[in-house]
From Swiss-Prot:
Localisation: Nucleus
SUPFAM superfamilies to which the protein is assigned, alphabetical: beta-beta-alpha zinc fingers, KRAB domain (Kruppel-associated box)
Primary subcellular site in the record, as a coarse category: nucleus
Organism (species): Homo sapiens (Human)
Record carries keyword Mitochondrion: no
Pfam families the record matches: KRAB, zf-C2H2
Record lineage: Eukaryota, Metazoa, Chordata, Craniata, Vertebrata
Name the UniProt record assigns to this protein: Zinc finger protein 586
Zinc finger C2H2-type: from-to: 88-116, 122-144, 150-172, 178-200, 206-228, 234-256, 262-284, 290-312, 317-339, 345-367, 373-395
Amino acid sequence: MAAAAALRAPAQSSVTFEDVAVNFSLEEWSLLNEAQRCLYRDVMLETLTLISSLGCWHGGEDEAAPSKQSTCIHIYKDQGGHSGERPYECGEYRKLFKNKSCLTEPRRDHKHRNVRTGERPYECSKYGKLFHQKPTLHIHERFHTGQKTYECSECGKSFHQSSSLLQRQTLHTRERPYECIECGKAFAEKSSLINHRKVHSGAKRYECNECGKSFAYTSSLIKHRRIHTGERPYECSECGRSFAENSSLIKHLRVHTGERPYECVECGKSFRRSSSLLQHQRVHTRERPYECSECGKSFSLRSNLIHHQRVHTGERHECGQCGKSFSRKSSLIIHLRVHTGERPYECSDCGKSFAENSSLIKHLRVHTGERPYECIDCGKSFRHSSSFRRHQRVHTGMRPYK
């Protein structure tokens, strides 16, 4: 309850249906094919359903008649629907409908009345979350089942909601009609532009009641609160590991699927994360954006700069068992396995286990026959970089040990 109150506390601006709707003129509508019209109807109905269930349209909190934006949605089903005429009026709420059936449907299924009275008769069987309308429940349930019924014909990616498909198709057409007057950045959706403007205004309206940190977006506050609650709602179905953010789960799943969607155009090497690709590309560009303020030495990775700075600060991570110290915490964690005997990395082929993941990777080459280090002078290849470096001395004549 406290979390919900914290999210509701700031005064939020009203959302009208017009803010999020896409409108067509009669001429534009006539140019659409049947599949495009069906997609448009699905998106508009879905959008109205979601806005209604949230109760956040203009006039949604008082008892006055709803505004024009919240009551009029022109979804063209045939030529007769172009007028948008709504001759049937609800006597209780003065809401207009095109079809008499919408007005006379059973009270429990009277969608607009449920929103007005606050009644939420539709319950999620998994988590018990309640909804005003049945279509909203169906949309919500797709996230539990993993059902993605809307597929993009351009790239094959599928989505839970038709509105998400429409957004994806906009990315392919590159149409970005909403431009920021401050910096000129353009967006496909009006809501994205509204969110972007907060960067310039510095507005941070959502405050954490635990630590006082404030955020521009409610979604950022929700994610942040999981630091305090320890909540990890996104669980991997393969290994049971859970995550605080859905994006982290998606990245983790690539460990199981082997998917590496980010490929380097220079050498063809692929990566699970976009950040890993960006780091790798610096090998080709020789970019070193992280510079030490003490000595001016620069690095391609921020983690390497942090590690280097300990040379100047003298900061070390000490082992409580033997007193040995390390400049990296990760090195201390690996070292502690000498004392505990822990070997968490096991070979699936022969069962041999290792204290370090890098040792397992090297061992796997015994089974796969992989020899990634090749000598450009004679073509001989090696499993380990250390063996490769020793071999190169045959060609260079270098004798480091005298």
